[in-house]
């Protein structure tokens, strides 16, 4: 399955929330696409609810099925609560960290910046969006890329104290992962236990 490149508003309406950020269309049409107005919804099966939650997580973080499954299997064998570890692994992806640091306005934009070699890890260019950032590593912007409009606009006025597990040096345009985020540090509205139940069948 290829990465979804269609209208983000359609996906946001599917889940009934702005999983890609603020969505003006969602405020007007807060019901799934294909449904005419707020008519009575059919009751979704237990499997359907679990599958929906997995899809929401995949769309939110821009991860394909094979990548998502691999992350789940890694989380399942790690210490800790499987669902929380899964979210921590998703949060630790380089594209997500670039987004959380405010270097890019969206995760999709962050993926592009990483893929196009605008981002460094510990001073070395890394162009793999799924690269797993470790505590203590420094995430920066290449010197020649610091003037890019998308980066400058995204960083302008960004609140870098939003996430306690990250810090940012405005002068050098370098961020640091202080520690792995706790579940309370992750603002995404994802019921990770449903994903664990789905994969445990």
Swiss-Prot record:
SUPFAM superfamilies reported in the protein's UniProt record: Alpha-L RNA-binding motif (SSF55174)
Superkingdom to which the source organism belongs: Bacteria
One Pfam family it belongs to: Ribosomal_S4
PROSITE patterns (UniProt xref): RIBOSOMAL_S4 (PS00632), S4 (PS50889)
Key word RNA-binding present: yes
Protein's GO biological process: ribosomal small subunit biogenesis; translation
Domain called S4 RNA-binding: residue spans: 92-155
GO MF assignments: rRNA binding; structural constituent of ribosome
Alphabetical list of InterPro entries matching this protein: Ribosomal_uS4, Ribosomal_uS4_bac-type, Ribosomal_uS4_CS, Ribosomal_uS4_N, S4_RNA-bd, S4_RNA-bd_sf
Keyword hit for Repeat: no
CC annotations in GO: small ribosomal subunit
Gene3D superfamilies: Ribosomal Protein S4 Delta 41, Chain A, domain 1 (1.10.1050.10), RNA-binding S4 domain (3.10.290.10)
Keyword entries, A-Z: Ribonucleoprotein, Ribosomal protein, RNA-binding, rRNA-binding
Residue numbers spanned by region Disordered: 26-48
NCBIfam families for the chain: PRK05327.1, rpsD_bact
Subunit structure: Part of the 30S ribosomal subunit. Contacts protein S5. The interaction surface between S4 and S5 is involved in control of translational fidelity.
PANTHER family, sorted: 30S 40S RIBOSOMAL PROTEIN (PTHR11831), SMALL RIBOSOMAL SUBUNIT PROTEIN US4M (PTHR11831:SF4)
Function: One of the primary rRNA binding proteins, it binds directly to 16S rRNA where it nucleates assembly of the body of the 30S subunit. With S5 and S12 plays an important role in translational accuracy.
Membership in a protein family: Belongs to the universal ribosomal protein uS4 family.
Record-given protein name: Small ribosomal subunit protein uS4
Provenance organism: Bacteroides thetaiotaomicron (strain ATCC 29148 / DSM 2079 / JCM 5827 / CCUG 10774 / NCTC 10582 / VPI-5482 / E50)
Gene that encodes it: rpsD
